[in-house]
């Protein structure tokens, strides 16, 4: 019987694991876990992991500007439905705001300037396709040869995102549109990123024919296969009908959301307050785990922290990056240590810029959607630029009286721009201006960001506020064969630890916040605790 649980990490994965442990995995749970003792360990002095929101005073004393130093928004699609349900259960759904329609535009930097990718008008799509020489790629795609391993659905088959889409769509379309998408999500090197771990659905559906035109003419077999895929993916997900009142807020139908007061940190703050009011849960800040070993007498796990304290747990859940978990098994399990070290990560720098009284900047970015992504072929040091004040105007028009009237003029001369630099070091093989952010000073990174905005957007003004955050090994990089590696890790754990040790976080299956919360739900469900 599980009586004492340890959780390593207090990012959204660790905090959501705590929540599901204490409250059950669904809305109808009447969880009686009052006897379950939970300890949460965090090596830093604050919770939240990569979710860190900063509040900056606006141009007036009663205004505040919301700046996201890490992830900037959530999507209410797929696993995002589970996140919306999670937010509803936390009791903070009234704080949700959906993004503005002004951020709907999708842009890519081409020939040194942001170019919009048409999404609505068929004529514009055709015109754009001819201009960028991708029409033939789309027309030929259904007739591309499928490798024998794919036809046979070999479970061990994997290839890079680059090779998959180059084979299906051609090199021009792949390097122009697929690669910047990968940079925006993973900061990844698409020549070594696993197709099965990033575009799993596309990889699984390839044996049935074309991914684009072919999807319009599905065979009965393909339709059934997709139904089975959807059924498996939607397990543990609520239906959209259960969340109608939240989707009614999305008047612009953007599916992108955050929180009006404190950005994404609103979730973190709420979860932290629940932990602080829970007498059977203890949060250890500035405490790292240095060793984990199995107690052969009873199968529990013995944990030692950096202060020499020892703990014993019936259940241990790790939500930290696997390469950070690895050293904890160096003495007790050399095989697991080696396996965990084999998972790769990417470093990225996020540069936040605020312009408080600058109508020119507002004018420059107002028609450029959420921002733009930068293909490596552009040979830029920057991999993406986000116009956060386009996405959430409330973030620059947020005063202490909660007066968010867009007609008061407060937001019209204030802007938030976020610049991303870095990514996986494999990018340097095709981009001479790639920057190793872990070996570059923050001042230099800021200078690169400002010079980029000057060159590309003609923004010469100095920002009123700047912040540079470097996430060293901050994003998992799912290399080719990633899923086989994860399976090997899981098999080793099952054989040697049973279900006493569970792995969560974003190193397994999906790097986003939605993925992390959903993974926590899956883990707690796997424990088969009563009233789940």
Curated annotation (Swiss-Prot):
EC code: 1.3.3.4
Pathway: Porphyrin-containing compound metabolism; protoporphyrin-IX biosynthesis; protoporphyrin-IX from protoporphyrinogen-IX: step 1/1
Keywords: FAD, Flavoprotein, Heme biosynthesis, Mitochondrion, Oxidoreductase, Porphyrin biosynthesis
Cofactor(s) needed by this chain: FAD
Annotated positions binding FAD: 9-14, 289, 511-513
Annotated GO biological process: cell motility; heme biosynthetic process; protoporphyrinogen IX biosynthetic process
Cofactor binding description: Binds 1 FAD per subunit.
GO MF: oxygen-dependent protoporphyrinogen oxidase activity
Cellular compartment(s): Mitochondrion
Assigned protein family: Belongs to the protoporphyrinogen/coproporphyrinogen oxidase family. Protoporphyrinogen oxidase subfamily.
Protein name (database record): Protoporphyrinogen oxidase
Organism: Dictyostelium discoideum
């Amino acid at each position: 019987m599980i009586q004492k649980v340890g959780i390593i990490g207090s990012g959204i994965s660790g905090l959501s694991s705590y929540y599901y442990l204490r409250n059950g995995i669904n809305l109808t749970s009447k969880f009686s876990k009052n006897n379950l003792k939970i300890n949460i360990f965090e090596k830093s002095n604050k919770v939240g992991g990569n979710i860190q929101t900063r509040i900056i005073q606006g141009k007036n004393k009663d205004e505040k500007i919301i700046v996201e130093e890490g992830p900037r928004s959530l999507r209410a699609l797929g696993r995002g439905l589970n996140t919306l349900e999670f937010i509803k259960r936390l009791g903070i759904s009234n704080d949700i705001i959906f993004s503005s329609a002004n951020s709907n535009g999708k842009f890519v930097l081409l020939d040194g300037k942001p170019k919009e990718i048409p999404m609505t008008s068929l004529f514009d799509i055709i015109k754009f396709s001819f201009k960028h020489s991708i029409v033939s790629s789309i027309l030929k795609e259904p007739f591309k040869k499928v490798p024998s391993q794919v036809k046979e659905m070999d479970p061990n088959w994997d290839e890079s995102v680059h090779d998959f889409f180059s084979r299906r769509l051609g090199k021009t379309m792949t390097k122009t549109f697929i690669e910047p998408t990968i940079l925006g999500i993973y900061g990844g090197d698409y020549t070594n990123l696993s197709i099965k771990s990033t575009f799993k659905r596309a990889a699984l559906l390839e044996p049935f024919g074309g991914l684009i035109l072919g999807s319009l003419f599905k065979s009965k077999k393909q339709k059934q296969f997709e139904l089975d895929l959807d059924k498996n993916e939607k397990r543990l997900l609520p239906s959209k009908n259960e969340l109608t009142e939240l989707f009614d807020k999305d008047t612009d139908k953007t599916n992108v959301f955050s929180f009006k007061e404190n950005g994404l940190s609103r979730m973190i703050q709420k979860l932290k307050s629940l932990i602080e009011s829970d007498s059977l849960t203890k949060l250890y800040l500035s405490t790292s785990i240095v060793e984990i070993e199995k107690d052969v007498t009873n199968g529990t796990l013995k944990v030692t922290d950096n202060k020499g304290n020892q703990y014993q747990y019936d259940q241990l859940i790790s939500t930290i990056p696997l390469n950070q978990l690895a050293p904890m098994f160096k003495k007790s399990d050399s095989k697991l240590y080696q396996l965990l070290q084999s998972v790769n990560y990417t470093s990225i720098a996020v540069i936040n810029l605020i312009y408080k009284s600058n109508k020119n900047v507002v004018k420059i970015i107002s028609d450029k959607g959420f921002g733009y992504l930068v293909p490596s072929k552009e040979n830029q040091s920057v991999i993406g630029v986000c116009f956060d004040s386009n996405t959430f105007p409330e973030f620059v028009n947020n005063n202490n009286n909660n007066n968010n009237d867009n007609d008061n003029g407060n937001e019209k001369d204030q802007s938030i721009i976020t610049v991303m630099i870095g990514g996986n070091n494999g990018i340097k093989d095709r981009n001479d201006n790639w920057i190793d952010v872990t070996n570059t000073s923050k001042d230099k990174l800021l200078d690169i960001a400002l010079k980029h905005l000057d060159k590309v957007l003609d923004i010469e003004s100095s920002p009123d506020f700047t912040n540079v955050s470097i996430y060293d090994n901050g994003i998992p990089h799912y290399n080719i064969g990633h899923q086989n590696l994860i399976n090997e890790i899981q098999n080793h754990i099952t054989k040697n630890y049973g279900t006493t040790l569970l792995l969560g976080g974003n190193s397994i299956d999906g790097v986003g916040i939605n993925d992390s919360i959903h993974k926590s739900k899956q883990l707690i469900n796997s424990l088969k605790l009563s009233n789940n």
